[in-house]
Amino acid sequence: MAKRKLTQNQTRRIQSNNAKTLHRHKKKDIEWSDEMLGESQEGVVVTRYSIHADVENEQGEIYRCNLRRTLSSLVVGDKVVWRKGNEQLQGVSGVIEAIHPRENEISRPDYYDGLKPIAANIDRIIIVSAVLPTLSLNIIDRYLVVCEIAGITPLIVLNKVDLLAQEQRQEIEDQLKIYQDIGYEILMISAKSGENMEKLTALLAQGTAIFVGQSGVGKSSLINHILPSVNAQVGDVSETSGLGQHTTTSSRLYHLPQGGNLIDSPGIREFGLWHLDAEQITKGYREFQYVLGTCKFRDCKHLSDPGCALREAVEQGKISPVRYDSYHRLIESLSETKSQRHFSLV
């Protein structure tokens, strides 16, 4: 008799219980006492694994560390206080004891575990899009909402422009003008031909940046161009879905030769925003801010409501109708996703 196939929830519970068991086992095996540890020192998390993290000290040396049980979360980019062990235990060299307050963080929503932090202390988010299979302004808008809410400067990068004919390129430049008009910086590049790669490298030298974007847009190819020694695995775009295969398994922080840091994180196929409410989404559209609060009614939905200042600004040509429509599609998808998520948890 064939075994009954496990449901997705059952599979997740089994995996979760297995991970917790392994976690408890590891903690029992490695118990650090004060006598086994050196003085406290500063460090930065450069890679986070399930129960360990790689920490870089002020001299640029990297050590694999355990986490104190009191630490609730730890992500790449976190500035930490840690102690080096007098000797290695099972390949582990020390313990992370505290996390400094974060300047900012970006998170992605997890349908079962709530918000899952990805990285912290970021100066710039590089939103990577590609011309194939199609340019999605909706995906760009989702990332821009995240940037605005987190207070992190975005850079919109359009990769693989070498695949465009001149007429196609002009059409895409026209599409992207709505972002330039409201102050967003755009860079059209090609990791293959090298177009504008020097400009991207110069921008990356200004602090800590993170690449975000769907799989298959060329993030790994860009990293290989910027940091050839890293040799990030490149994934092909699926012919059926138009999406690339996930090629990065753990987020990691790299130091760039010209200065600055780059965080590479696993591709996110759908950057969900269901953890945000409509008011937060609205604040994620920077060009809306000067009219917010001036509508006739406080509960204005910015649709056909009488006296809607936002809609009037669109009609007067002060706000792009493309961005206005994108905003409402995002609000609608937010409601649909929340109801689906609620249903899946019942």
UniProtKB/Swiss-Prot annotation:
Cofactor note: Binds 1 zinc ion per subunit.
InterPro entries: G_CP_dom, NA-bd_OB-fold, P-loop_NTPase, Ribosome_biogen_GTPase_RsgA, RsgA_GTPase_dom
Cofactor: Zn(2+)
Compartments, record wording: Cytoplasm
Chief place of localization: cytoplasm
Polar residues bias locations: 7-20
Stretches assigned to the CP-type G domain: 103-271
Annotated function: One of several proteins that assist in the late maturation steps of the functional core of the 30S ribosomal subunit. Helps release RbfA from mature subunits. May play a role in the assembly of ribosomal proteins into the subunit. Circularly permuted GTPase that catalyzes slow GTP hydrolysis, GTPase activity is stimulated by the 30S ribosomal subunit.
Residues that coordinate or bind GTP: 159-162, 213-221
Ranges where the record places region Disordered: 1-26
Gene Ontology CC terms: cytoplasm
Keyword set, alphabetical order: Cytoplasm, GTP-binding, Hydrolase, Metal-binding, Nucleotide-binding, Ribosome biogenesis, RNA-binding, rRNA-binding, Zinc
GO MF annotation: an example: rRNA binding
SUPFAM superfamilies: P-loop containing nucleoside triphosphate hydrolases
Keyword check for rRNA-binding: yes
Disulphides: none
Subunit structure: Monomer. Associates with 30S ribosomal subunit, binds 16S rRNA.
PROSITE patterns in UniProt: ENGC_GTPASE, G_CP
A Gene Ontology biological process term: ribosomal small subunit biogenesis
Annotated gene: rsgA
Protein name: Small ribosomal subunit biogenesis GTPase RsgA
Pfam family, one: RsgA_GTPase
Amino acids binding Zn(2+): 295, 300, 302, 308
Family label: Belongs to the TRAFAC class YlqF/YawG GTPase family. RsgA subfamily.
EC annotation from Swiss-Prot or TrEMBL: 3.6.1.-
